[in-house]
Regions:
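Oxidoreductase and adenylate-handling cofactor-binding alpha/beta cores
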Residues: 51-67, 92-95, 223-231
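NAD(P)-binding Rossmann-fold cofactor-contacting core
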Residues: 92-109
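Rossmann-like adenosine-cofactor binding region
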Residues: 105-197
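C-terminal helix-to-coil terminal segments
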Residues: 33, 40-49, 192-235
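Phosphate/diphosphate ligand-binding glycine-rich loop within oxidoreductases
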Residues: 1-65
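A short helix->loop->beta-strand "cap" motif at the edges of active sites that frequently abuts
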Residues: 11-15, 35-38, 95, 154-156, ...
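Glycine-rich adenosine-cofactor-binding loop
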Residues: 43, 51, 70-91
Length: 235
């Protein structure tokens, strides 16, 4: 992805950025705000594709590890466009579902949500579907850090299709090596486009950030970006 930051944009005539992606961590939003540059992303454009990836991965994992999904509990961290669809997939499999989403919990109340600590203690499957925020109230950078892995009780399988930096790679490797987790399913990697070869060799499923790649996802993202451009320029 092109990094849309001060180095690229300063002195240019750019007034609007449309990214055909869910994530926008490649856009320096603070600089854009200072420079008067508006931007938009495409939330939910490929959510069905990512949910299908999770569905397929769970079926593969179930088969390889001889698991009965309807006896397990899944923790979904981030319950937006993707996470909500993953919850439906899990429910259809008969899996007990726990949801963690701090921004939604603060808006909607605690009734439907639980803490990350409870997910760490009770879940056999933990899957991450949060945007990458490197700082601030809802920081997700290294959300799964050493403290998180040390709090795990059930040796879960860890799934990440959000952003590589949401999980501390070094700590993830340590957890795989010492048995704190049973498996990992990884589609996103720290420091992309590089892929950590040691981690790749240890995960049960490893893919190069393709969970959301589908014809429908690309078409949706393109349409959403085009609509945003037309709206901005009053076309």
């Amino acid at each position: 992805r092109t990094h849309c930051n001060q180095e690229l944009l300063e002195g240019s005539r750019v007034k609007f950025i449309a990214t055909a992606t869910i994530g926008f961590d490649h856009i320096d939003t603070e600089y854009c705000k200072r420079a008067g540059i508006e931007w938009t992303n495409a939330p939910g454009c490929n959510s069905a594709s990512v949910a299908q990836y999770i569905q397929s991965s769970l079926l593969i994992w179930k088969s390889l590890r001889n698991k009965k999904l309807d006896e397990l509990t899944i923790g979904i961290v981030g319950v937006g466009n993707v996470g909500s669809k993953v919850a439906k997939v899990a429910e259809d499999f008969g899996i007990r579902v726990l949801l963690n989403d701090l921004p939604r919990e603060e808006k909607e109340g605690k009734e439907s949500f639980t803490s990350l600590n409870k997910i760490a203690e009770e879940c056999d499957i933990i899957t991450f579907h949060v945007p990458l925020y490197k700082e601030g109230k809802y920081k997700t950078f290294h959300l799964a850090d050493e403290d998180f892995f040390n709090s795990l009780k059930r040796k879960p399988v860890i799934i990440n299709t959000s952003r590589g930096e949401v999980i501390d790679t070094g700590t993830l490797l340590k957890a795989l090596n010492n048995g704190s987790i049973s498996d990992a399913i990884i589609d996103v990697w720290e420091h992309e486009p590089e892929i950590n070869r040691e981690l790749l060799e240890k995960v049960i499923i490893g893919t190069p950030h393709i969970a959301g790649y589908s014809a429908d996802g690309k078409a949706n993202a393109t349409r959403m970006s085009l609509d945003a451009i037309c709206k901005f320029f009053h076309i």
